[in-house]
Amino acid sequence: MDINLFDFHLPEELIAQTPLEKRETSRLMVLDRETGDIEHKHFSDILAYLHEGDCLVLNETKVMPARLHGVKEDTGAHIEVLLLKQEEGDTWETLVKPAKRVKEGTVISFGEGKLKATCVGTADQGGRQLEFSYDGIFYEILDELGEMPLPPYIKETLEDRDRYQTVYAKEIGSAAAPTAGLHFTEELLEKLQQKGVKLAFITLHVGLGTFRPVSTDKIEDHHMHAEYYHMSQETADLLNDVKVNGGRIITVGTTSTRTLETIATEHDGKLCGASGWTDIFMYPGYEFKAIDGLITNFHLPKSTLIMLVSAFAGRENVLHAYNEAVKEKYRFFSFGDAMFLASHAKERMK
């Protein structure tokens, strides 16, 4: 498929630069994946669209303050490092800028030597393997020296780090937030549970794929960067029980979707406890095996994320919805508004 089939016009002023004061006050577009019908709501209205017996699947990964600013020990030149994933011990796959200045053996110092990194090799797609040395606890030092790795299209400074974390973030390891979950408050999750909606938690650590645009004209030629996922057998049992009893599995975000679909693809359509690395790439023609609905933000033109959403709800339906979102001035991307996509999505409980 031609990548231009997933393009749309997006005025720059619709890219949300800061989160709203209250998470649940963002807008919600409800899209029926069968008919293409659209409703305009607020995120707190999601209560009306989820039924007793349904299950929300949430990614409880926690974002690291993964962006570090350091200097080369030999020249004092400024180097920016973005941690992507931990390999063995204190060795990490990273992105560095400017990459041409960081060769094998280069030593980078952060926080006046509180943290040091030595380049021990190259990684996929221009990355670098850095081995860190320090005294103390790595994540405590990272918390002190690091910055939240906001996407490049967000120019504003984030005053409160917690606004780039979900309220249920638990397992540290991501280089970006699973942004669909940013709309939920503890109170809203409690109301959903009181209604009989179940909550299930998985982990997928968001990595390089989030930062890499598709660089091929034919989307089939694009290769996703692998990301680590984990789902417990207890969670799998809960999800299978939901299915048996006629409930819907609603994933919160593309990361939860990729986790469940990876597991179902690798286990003959069944959900079971599993851990591993996924590079699954979903675009129109992909047959979904695990999920019945999806909550997600509005994504970049020509991105793998809009391709995933198009695979689930149909490219024409999705592009029509996106053009409607532009017309209605929805806020886009990480701090933007949300969509709920499902079959018969407009059929709310009376």
Curated annotation (Swiss-Prot):
Disulfide bonds: none
Keyword Transferase: yes
Protein name per Swiss-Prot or TrEMBL: S-adenosylmethionine:tRNA ribosyltransferase-isomerase
GO biological process, one term: tRNA wobble guanine modification
InterPro entries to which the protein is assigned, alphabetical: QueA, QueA_dom1, QueA_dom2, QueA_sf
Stored PANTHER family: S-ADENOSYLMETHIONINE:TRNA RIBOSYLTRANSFERASE-ISOMERASE
Principal location class: cytoplasm
